[in-house]
């Protein structure tokens, strides 16, 4: 089995790469995916988003090592094991990131990945329904929409932000990210619009793309060049030969794992695992970053939340309505309002993100209280804490060792304490007077720094945005794994393109920038001149130097 290009992983970036490499019909492409079909309502119905993330059938099901700053809890670290990868099991939220994120990438050595460079790729990939004119793409593969925003709690949240003195934004993926506004979703005609639906399935219809269901064991390297991928399929070990290049797009956990199993990584660690060193790249597995969040929950004194729909019977009614019409509550992820805020004066960009939900539920999907309620998922998104991914053994079937080192930087604690107090201020605004009941979580008695810290240690969870473990940078940077054209330094014919190459975590959910990475990487692989740089200047808050709002 062979093709011009072999891609490991059918996720956000891998699907986009397959689509672009196969576009003109010149090249053959094989996409290797360990997971199975994405068919069925658990994945395709937006409101069912909590299900695939908790199902072993669709998810690698990783756990972190005990996190010392979080009461030694092992934190859930899901990654998609299904066609479409994590874009098939995520929360369907679409955020490009802030302009400063990508300018920071370039400062860290990713030349050609500044905001002016990547904005044209965001436009190329988007089919935006209702975004800011001139800033959004309108004919790309990825449909992006807003929800119906029919619940009054969404409007109360946005009004509360304005009453607290914060900015409003008509399109946070346009010129102005900062402020309260409506959240965008990767949903089209009532269905999840994953990378599989947007990119991979259309590419498979061309006849020069083949999807292979198999488990990648290692990249085969001969004389310093990647020549194929060793996989397990139907109980046998096989080789998939790459006539031109191998592209690894296997996630921020599995991309470094596969490189290390192939002999690319920190030499001392590889030797400890009994793996022959092909390229000593100490940055493989290092620089792990993520977003954390907690749920701030409040009782609603009016019966307007989604609490009535939580019993199994009514969930079944919503599911049946979606199956028949692709409409109703099932056609939205229910994240329809949001905010992007700065925690302090002097910041160039927002660093706190809110997802607002018109129901109070726990991580397992059960009601947080026996009453109507609402909640905000609150996260500080520019943490300085760093972790790593290493091998557990040389056995490809062993899970990687994931150490996030969450909350290991003192600033993280300061910022998250601020998040708790800021959310109380927002929920305390006049707009919520008709809805606000008792505080469920953290609880009205949680006030001091010590009490808030104890709450955070017990309740902080991952927002499932890992990145950075195969960092992109200058070829002379010893910690860089790939150069700005996504080529693995020290090995010919091998690239990595997914969220693992991000030099720094972006501000927001990672599906959007991961797809953009695949789009831009495809041009590099094909040797195309990058799209012309944009000269559009994003909005800058004129009060940023003196105010946090």
Swiss-Prot record:
Residues 528-549 are annotated as: Disordered. Disulfide bonds: none annotated. Pathway: Amine and polyamine biosynthesis; betaine biosynthesis via choline pathway; betaine aldehyde from choline (cytochrome c reductase route): step 1/1. It comes from the Bacteria. Its EC number is 1.1.99.1, 1.2.1.8. Keywords: FAD, Flavoprotein, NAD, Oxidoreductase. It catalyses: choline + A = betaine aldehyde + AH2; betaine aldehyde + NAD(+) + H2O = glycine betaine + NADH + 2 H(+). GO terms for biological process: glycine betaine biosynthetic process from choline. Pfam families: GMC_oxred_C, GMC_oxred_N. GO terms for molecular function: betaine-aldehyde dehydrogenase (NAD+) activity; choline dehydrogenase activity; flavin adenine dinucleotide binding. InterPro entries: BetA, FAD/NAD-bd_sf, GMC_OxRdtase, GMC_OxRdtase_N, GMC_OxRtase_C. It is an enzyme of class 1 (oxidoreductase). The active site is at residue 465. FAD binds at residues 4-33. Its cofactor is FAD. HAMAP family: Choline_dehydrogen. Involved in the biosynthesis of the osmoprotectant glycine betaine. Catalyzes the oxidation of choline to betaine aldehyde and betaine aldehyde to glycine betaine at the same rate. PANTHER family: CHOLINE DEHYDROGENASE, MITOCHONDRIAL (PTHR11552:SF147), GLUCOSE-METHANOL-CHOLINE GMC OXIDOREDUCTASE (PTHR11552). Belongs to the GMC oxidoreductase family. This is Oxygen-dependent choline dehydrogenase. The gene is betA.
């Amino acid at each position: 089995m062979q093709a011009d290009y072999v891609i490991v992983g059918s996720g956000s970036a891998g699907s986009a790469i397959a689509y672009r490499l196969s576009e003109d019909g010149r090249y053959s492409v094989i996409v290797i995916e360990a997971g199975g079909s994405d068919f069925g309502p658990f994945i395709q119905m937006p409101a069912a988003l909590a299900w695939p993330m908790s199902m072993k059938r669709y998810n690698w099901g990783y756990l972190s090592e005990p996190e010392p700053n979080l009461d030694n809890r092992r934190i859930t670290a899901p990654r998609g094991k299904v066609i479409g990868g994590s874009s098939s099991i995520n929360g369907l939220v679409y955020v490009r990131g802030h302009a400063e994120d990508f300018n920071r990438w370039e400062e860290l050595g990713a030349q050609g990945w500044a905001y002016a460079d990547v904005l044209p790729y965001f436009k190329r990939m988007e089919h935006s329904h209702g975004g800011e004119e001139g800033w959004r793409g309108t004919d790309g593969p990825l449909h992006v929409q807003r929800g119906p925003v029919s619940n009054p709690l969404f409007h109360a949240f946005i009004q509360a932000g304005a009453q607290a003195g914060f900015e409003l934004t008509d399109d946070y993926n346009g010129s102005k990210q900062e402020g309260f506004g409506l959240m965008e979703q990767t949903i089209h005609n009532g269905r999840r619009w994953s990378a599989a639906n947007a990119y991979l399935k259309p590419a498979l219809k061309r006849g020069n793309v083949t999807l292979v269901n198999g488990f990648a064991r290692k990249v085969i390297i001969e004389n310093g060049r990647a020549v194929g991928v060793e996989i397990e399929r139907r109980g046998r070990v096989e080789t998939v030969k790459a006539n031109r290049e191998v592209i690894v797009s296997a996630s921020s956990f599995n991309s470094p794992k596969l490189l290390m199993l192939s002999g690319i990584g920190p030499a001392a660690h590889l030797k400890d695992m009994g793996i022959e060193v092909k390229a000593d790249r100490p940055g493989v597995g290092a620089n792990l970053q993520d977003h954390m969040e907690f749920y701030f929950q409040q009782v609603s004194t009016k019966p307007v939340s989604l609490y009535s729909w939580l019993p199994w019977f009514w969930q079944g009614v919503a599911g049946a309505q979606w199956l028949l019409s692709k409409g109703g509550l099932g056609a939205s992820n229910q994240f329809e309002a949001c905010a992007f805020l700065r925690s302090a004066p002097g910041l160039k960009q927002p660093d706190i993100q809110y997802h607002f939900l018109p129901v109070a539920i726990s991580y397992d999907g059960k009601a947080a209280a026996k009453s109507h309620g609402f909640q905000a998922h609150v996260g500080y998104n520019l943490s300085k804490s760093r972790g790593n991914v290493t091998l557990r053994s040389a056995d490809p079937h062993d899970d990687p060792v994931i150490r996030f080192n969450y909350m290991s930087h003192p600033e993280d604690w300061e910022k998250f304490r601020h998040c708790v107090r800021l959310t109380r201020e927002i929920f305390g605004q006049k707009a919520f007077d008709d809805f606000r009941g008792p505080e469920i979580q953290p609880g009205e008695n949680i006030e001091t720094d010590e009490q808030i810290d104890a709450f955070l240690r017990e309740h902080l969870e991952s927002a499932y945005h890992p990145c950075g473990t195969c960092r992109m940078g200058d070829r002379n940077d010893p910690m860089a794994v790939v150069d700005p054209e996504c080529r693995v330094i020290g090995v010919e014919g091998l690239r990595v393109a997914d969220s693992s190459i991000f030099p720094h975590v972006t501000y927001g959910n990672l599906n959007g920038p991961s797809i953009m990475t695949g789009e831009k990487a495809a041009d590099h692989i094909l040797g195309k001149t990058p799209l012309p740089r944009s000269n559009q200047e994003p909005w800058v808050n004129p009060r940023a130097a003196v105010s946090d709002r």
